[in-house]
């Protein structure tokens, strides 16, 4: 691709308000985004390898770009280079606190305590409850055999969010409900304190 293909278009007036500007991503950036979505939908080594040349050029041009680094981490994960992917996520989380970064790093983490701490941070750094439900379900899974009261708290929050969004209860969630039957969940204050302690016990870097 030429330099022109990598050049973002001149900002144009935004429909959101007078005086504001939006920048149209370059052709190459748009292709990279499409390739990443395809990889997420079909996470195969072949698809990762196809995207690699474009991604490597993007990294050469924008070595600190958050999206490019994230895409590279996902490709490394698919290709089995887990340590390289983890290094990138840790680098990203030194300067960014996006909830999905914590969750994606959690998926690469084997230690149950560290994994739980990362999902705690994903929950804390996501303002919209509807996007927390998946993180809460993952945390409940991790806690169900270790701390049933906290697992019950997260599961109830997850179920409430799913109902608000019009989602049904899956077979897995039904099984978890049965497993936690009769368990009294902790309070909001107790769980917030738990998040804090987990983050202190398992620092990211």
Regions found by a protein language model. Give the residues of each.
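Charged, low-complexity interaction regions that mediate assembly/partner binding
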Residues: 169-205
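Single-residue signature of alpha-solenoid repeat helices
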Residues: 51, 85, 115, 151-152
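Inward-facing hydrophobic residues that define packing positions of alpha-helical scaffold repeats
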Residues: 48, 55, 89, 119, ...
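Residue position in alpha-helical solenoids
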Residues: 54, 61, 88, 95, ...
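TPR/TPR-like (Sel1-like) alpha-helical repeat modules
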Residues: 93-97, 119-127, 144-167
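Amphipathic alpha-helical repeat scaffolds of TPR domains
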Residues: 1-15, 20-42, 50, 61-74, ...
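Intrinsically disordered, low-complexity segments enriched in Gly and acidic/Ser/Thr residues
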Residues: 89, 97-104, 110, 114-120, ...
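Structural motif corresponding to the intra-repeat A-B loop/turn of tetratricopeptide repeats
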Residues: 41-45, 79, 109-113, 145-146
């Amino acid at each position: 691709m030429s330099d022109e293909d990598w050049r973002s278009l001149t900002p144009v007036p935004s429909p959101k308000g007078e005086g504001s500007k939006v920048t149209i991503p370059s052709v190459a950036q748009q292709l990279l985004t499409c390739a990443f979505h395809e990889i997420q939908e079909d996470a195969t080594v072949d698809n990762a390898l196809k995207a690699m040349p474009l991604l490597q050029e993007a990294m050469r041009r924008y070595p600190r770009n958050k999206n490019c680094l994230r895409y590279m981490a996902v490709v490394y994960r698919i290709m089995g280079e887990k340590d390289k992917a983890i290094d990138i996520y840790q680098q990203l989380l030194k300067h960014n606190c996006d909830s999905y970064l914590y969750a994606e790093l959690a998926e690469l983490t084997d230690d149950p305590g560290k994994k739980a701490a990362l999902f705690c941070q994903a929950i804390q750094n996501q303002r919209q409850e509807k996007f927390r439900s998946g993180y809460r379900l993952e945390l409940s899974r991790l806690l169900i055999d270790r701390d049933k009261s906290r697992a019950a708290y997260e599961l109830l929050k997850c179920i409430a969010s799913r109902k608000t969004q019009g989602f049904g209860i899956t077979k897995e969630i039904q099984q978890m409900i049965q497993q936690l039957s009769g368990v009294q969940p902790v309070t909001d204050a107790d769980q917030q304190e738990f998040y804090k302690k987990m983050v202190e016990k398992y620092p990211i870097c």
